[in-house]
């Protein structure tokens, strides 16, 4: 289920746009995640109290965490599927400490796609969307495999 060189190029081209405003993109991704799937908010002790979108937008902690999430994801995407070293600590913390189910990674993947569609319609056409979906699925599948190795049934 690997991506072609052309698909990776599409992914990295749009990711360059994301890196121009990591905090803005990250904040938007988390807001979409929490609004679309409120149950995910329960996994974040420091954000549980944020119920309204305006509260989320005003939270510097949420913006900071969004930056952290997208920085980590960008590092993984740039490895073009050769991301085992980057993935291992992420899988470890998300399985053992945070206990984030794979389903929630699907939810955040959807939010990422939606944010990219919204913010970069000219650079995120059908081909780029398909490539990004494949890249995020590869990431999720590899995380799920690591979860299994760790005995986490997320």
Swiss-Prot record:
Q: Record's Gene3D superfamilies?
A: 6.10.140.2100, 6.10.140.2110
Query: Where in the sequence is Phosphoserine found?
Result: 4
The chain positions of domain Globin read 2-148
Residues bound to heme b: 94
Residues binding O2 are 65
The biological processes this protein is annotated with in GO are:
removal of superoxide radicals
Kindly state which reaction or reactions the protein catalyses. Answer: Fe(III)-heme b-[protein] + nitric oxide + H2O = Fe(II)-heme b-[protein] + nitrite + 2 H(+); H2O2 + AH2 = A + 2 H2O
Where is nitrite annotated to bind? 65
Q: What is its EC number?
A: 1.7.-.-, 1.11.1.-
Q: Which UniProt keywords apply?
A: Cytoplasm, Heme, Iron, Metal-binding, Muscle protein, Oxidoreductase, Oxygen transport, Phosphoprotein, Transport
Q: What is the role of the protein in this entry?
A: Monomeric heme protein which primary function is to store oxygen and facilitate its diffusion within muscle tissues. Reversibly binds oxygen through a pentacoordinated heme iron and enables its timely and efficient release as needed during periods of heightened demand. Depending on the oxidative conditions of tissues and cells, and in addition to its ability to bind oxygen, it also has a nitrite reductase activity whereby it regulates the production of bioactive nitric oxide.
Q: Which family does it belong to?
A: Belongs to the globin family.
**Subunit arrangement?**
Monomeric.
Q: What is this protein called?
A: Myoglobin
């Amino acid at each position: 289920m690997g991506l072609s060189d052309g698909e990776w190029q599409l992914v990295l081209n749009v990711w360059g746009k994301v890196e121009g405003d990591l905090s803005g993109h990250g904040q938007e991704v988390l807001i979409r995640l929490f609004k679309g799937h409120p149950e995910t908010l329960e996994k974040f002790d420091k954000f549980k109290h944020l119920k309204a979108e305006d509260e989320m937008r005003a939270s510097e902690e949420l913006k900071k965490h969004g930056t952290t999430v997208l920085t980590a994801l960008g590092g993984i995407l740039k490895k073009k599927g050769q991301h085992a070293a980057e993935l291992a600590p992420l899988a470890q913390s998300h399985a053992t400490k945070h206990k984030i189910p794979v389903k929630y990674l699907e939810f955040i993947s959807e939010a990422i796609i939606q944010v990219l569609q919204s913010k970069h319609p000219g650079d995120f056409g059908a081909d780029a969307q398909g490539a990004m979906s494949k890249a995020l699925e590869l990431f999720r599948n590899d995380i799920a495999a690591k979860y299994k190795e760790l005995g986490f049934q997320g």
